[in-house]
């Protein structure tokens, strides 16, 4: 089991500092105006409309608004970490649906890269896995906060799959020189990426999150003997997703004509 360094009281919270106050945020498209996002062929430095800090940007909205990764995800973390600490839910997909239903979680965005490992860690604990959940969540937030938005299209690695790898790395105490644990999270990430790629694009953070969690639950049972029950998920976000695959998505409702 992973041994995560204990921090002092000032660092004990799982949640990052809140970003500067902003205008009302939209759930889909641009957080500030709701207009569609325009992606660049190359990253460029831009100033965040919320915190004012300069950061590398791979997109703006049609009106040129840019919101950095930290501001995109910080508000949601402050709400879903306490929810997961208090939850007794054993189904990680059900937990994922509870978290993404929070109004602070957007249709797409890097917060999903953090939600995936945190949900899996909570479900692992709730199904009898031995883990100090608060410490594990703190470490998952730290690591997954470094996984930027848009990497599915720019790096060829979906952040949901990377989040599953973070989850398994924390469980096993993996590091770059750990002979036995080192390959295992990478196998899980590869498994998740195969499942995600098989469905096809364009991206949907809800779909890829569910697929990564499903593969991680099966992987966990096979490797560690901790079974996580998985219920059926019927998506209700297709109306908010401009790029929804509709009947091409395994979570799309099977409406009767």
Predicted regions mapped to residue ranges:
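Polybasic, low-complexity association/targeting segments
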Residues: 85-117, 202
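Residues immediately within or flanking Cys/His clusters that coordinate Zn2+
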Residues: 10, 27, 45, 58, ...
């Amino acid at each position: 089991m992973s041994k995560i360094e204990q921090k002092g009281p000032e660092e004990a919270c799982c949640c990052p500092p809140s970003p500067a106050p902003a205008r009302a945020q939209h759930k889909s498209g641009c957080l500030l105006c709701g207009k569609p996002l325009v992606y660049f062929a190359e990253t460029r430095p831009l100033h965040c409309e919320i915190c004012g800090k300069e950061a590398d940007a791979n997109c703006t909205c049609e009106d040129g608004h840019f919101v950095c990764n930290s501001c995109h995800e910080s508000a949601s973390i402050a709400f879903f970490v306490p929810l997961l600490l208090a939850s007794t839910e054993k189904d990680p997909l059900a937990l994922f649906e509870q978290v993404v239903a929070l109004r602070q979680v957007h249709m797409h965005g890097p917060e999903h890269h953090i939600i995936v490992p945190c949900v899996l860690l909570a479900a692992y604990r709730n199904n009898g896995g031995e883990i100090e959940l608060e410490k594990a969540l703190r470490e998952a937030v730290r690591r997954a906060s470094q996984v930027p938005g848009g990497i599915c299209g720019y790096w060829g690695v979906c952040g949901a799959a990377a989040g599953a790898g973070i989850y398994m790395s924390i469980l096993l105490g993996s590091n770059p020189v750990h002979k036995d644990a080192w390959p295992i999270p990478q196998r899980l990430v590869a498994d998740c990426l195969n499942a995600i790629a098989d469905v096809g694009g364009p991206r949907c953070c809800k779909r890829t999150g569910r697929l990564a969690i499903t593969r991680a639950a099966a992987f966990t049972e096979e490797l560690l003997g901790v079974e996580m029950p998985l219920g059926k998920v019927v998506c209700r976000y297709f109306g908010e997703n401009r790029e929804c695959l509709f009947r091409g998505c395994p979570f799309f409702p099977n409406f009767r004509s």
